[in-house]
Amino acid sequence: VAQTRVTQSALAGIQASDTLRVGAYFNAAPFTWLNERGEVDGYEADIINAIAIELGLTVEFVQVTRQNDDEMLLSGAVDVLIGQQARSHDREAIFDFSHPYYVNEHRMVIRQGEPYGSLEQLAGHAIAVEIGSRSERALRRWSEARGVPFEIVTYLSERAALDALAAHEVDGMVGLLDSLRRAGRQQMSLVNEPVMVEPYAIVLRRADNNFRRLLDRSLQRLKASGRLEQIYAEWFGAEPMDFVTLVPVYDDLYEDTRGVDDFAREVPLPAYPVRERLASGQPLRVAGIAAEGQDAPAVVRLMNGLNRALVEEMARRWNTTVEYVPDSVTDPAALVASGAADLAVGVYPRWSGADEFDYSLPYLMHGDRLLVPANSRLSGFQDMLGTNWIIGYFADDPDGEEQVMKYAEHFNVGQNLRTFQITRESDAIYTMTVEDNISAIFGDSLRLQALMRESDPST
């Protein structure tokens, strides 16, 4: 693929024409295809149409193929690509991607009853793939990365590869999970371990950051309104998909009232190019690690350990070292925006900062939880029948008591319980399990997990 430096955003043409030109495969059902009425249809087509409605644009679908799609995008013939467009490390060197909205898997199929519980157990066996497919590349990469050899046998189609498995010509077959499900083959089963996970997203030209933010804002609004899940259910029914992780909804999302014409057409170079710094041998500067004094809460120690392990593994893979920026907990993202840090951990994404820096996908989710003794019959507020339930909350949580009562009223058990203020975090579990003065502890799940780990390191 010939890569050229783009100096103007796709927004220039979109703003001039009020039209979004979408490159799409016309034969990739149920994601994008041309239906019997001559209309582009499918899950991704519906997402694009919903985005266009949200932005006040008209959609023009342009047919592309797997041979010319990349060139069509890079040349400016289309503004975006859709249709099982896989977000991969290789492609990220050339393109940018929106939030992913579907996760597929390349999976190994075996005959039902065969004794293969993992991919490694099929080492040396004949495995069928469709020739030239992404599944063939995924299997070869998995094999090379792990040093596990397969006899890879290619067929002209997925159907022919499945037929070969049924006829005992091979012992396994690798294909895309959604396609394998639609094939509906009897007497076959899946090996639990995926060969490769493949997220699908909207593809746009690299470094077109303003356009990408506009697309991501629309996807987040579709997620926040429930429309994204509705579109998904229309095509895939009850098949699970983790949209909470795939399309995170940032704080203050709806406070951004800008329209399409308000986004800049230019594609600016980054003010502080991190890759160049790392390539020159300088360390990765990380903000957001808290100081661990004697009185530091347990959750600080837990999160510091997790965040250090995360960034140090990243640095190892990037062949660089880590430098932790001191006194950087108050606003670590601002240090990234100013160039004083390369990366910030433990950041809550907010849309008002999206023009200054990029966020990764979430790597940790947390929320309100109840911690109860191991032998308790409580699984939640709904079990607090009768009276004399005492729920502890932390004194330094300004909304703790109010939140306890809100949950209690929601489950119609407000009259059955009373609250207890925990002034010393270190006493919380002892008060519940030894003194038996409270029935449960209410708090943030990370804080409760940290207390559990320090009380019993085996948890």
Label each region the model flagged.
Residues 1-64, 224-330, 337-340, 377-383, ...:
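N-terminal hydrophobic or amphipathic helices and topogenic motifs
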Residues 4-5, 134-153, 187-190, 220-267, ...:
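Ligand-binding clefts/hinges and TM-proximal coupling segments of bilobed small-molecule sensing domains
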Residues 7, 60-71, 114, 151-164, ...:
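Short helix-initiation/N-cap motifs at beta->coil->alpha
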Residues 23-29, 62-67, 76-88, 112, ...:
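Beta->alpha turn/N-cap motifs
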Residues 26, 101-110, 177, 181-219, ...:
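Periplasmic-binding protein-like
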Residues 68-71, 84-94, 138-143, 162-196, ...:
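A ligand-binding cleft/hinge motif common to bilobed small-molecule-binding domains
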Residues 99, 110-127, 361, 372-391:
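Flexible hinge/capping segments at coil-to-helix
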